[in-house]
A protein has these predicted regions:
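Conserved C-terminal alpha-helix-loop-beta "cap" of PLP-dependent enzymes
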Residues: 61-72, 76-182
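Active-site C-terminal subdomain of aminotransferase-like
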Residues: 2-89, 174, 182
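Generic low-polarity alpha-helical segments
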Residues: 1-2, 148
């Protein structure tokens, strides 16, 4: 509890929650530990996601696919685009990412007519938190130029596993010939 002058109580409320919201958001009831842990872990998690994006760009560029940004370009977010030029490539990539998921890895994502899109879309995200963009995920519209958008990985190792599983899925689907990987 905090007791004292109104102005001091208000300052405490802003300090313990957020400026401008203060007491209006109510008690935090034990969630502050999770917030602070998130702040503490954020640099490590973002670093892992960025390393995963660079790894994906490097591999897919070396085997002949167009990637944006490329492996050596300056980065301003965690999203990595890979253009496959075919629906089969987008689908196999997303299915490989889903297979590496910590949640629902047994699910096989399929393209579908999602509201708000002008084409079918496929999404892979076996995440702990639905809609989390920092967790390993991939999605893409099933239309030319057939690009997929990869992001996340709570750890570098998980991002790497996702990319390796995506490669295996592309090989299994006949999109990539295994001999292309010899140069890696």
């Amino acid at each position: 509890y905090v007791a004292g002058k109104k102005e001091l109580i208000e300052n405490c409320a802003y300090r313990l929650t957020s400026p401008g919201l203060g007491k209006e958001v109510g008690a935090s009831l034990g969630v502050m530990q999770s917030f602070y842990q998130g702040f503490f872990m954020a640099p490590t998690v973002v670093c892992g996601a960025l390393k995963g994006a660079v790894f994906a760009a490097n591999i897919y560029e070396k085997i002949g696919y167009s990637v944006v940004p490329n492996a050596s370009e300056s980065r301003h977010d965690i999203i990595q685009a890979v253009t496959f030029g075919s629906a089969d490539g987008v689908i196999a990539f997303c299915q490989g990412i889903q297979a590496a998921a910590p949640v629902d890895s047994y699910v096989t994502p399929e393209p579908w007519a999602m509201p708000g899109y002008d084409s079918e879309v496929i999404m892979a995200a076996g995440a702990f938190v639905q809609g989390s963009s920092i967790e390993l995920s991939a999605d893409g519209p099933i239309k030319p130029p057939y690009a997929v958008y990869f992001q996340g990985g709570l750890t570098w190792q998980h991002a790497k596993l996702g990319i390796l599983k995506s490669l295996q899925s592309l090989i299994d689907a006949g999109v990539i010939d295994r001999s292309k990987l010899q140069s890696l």
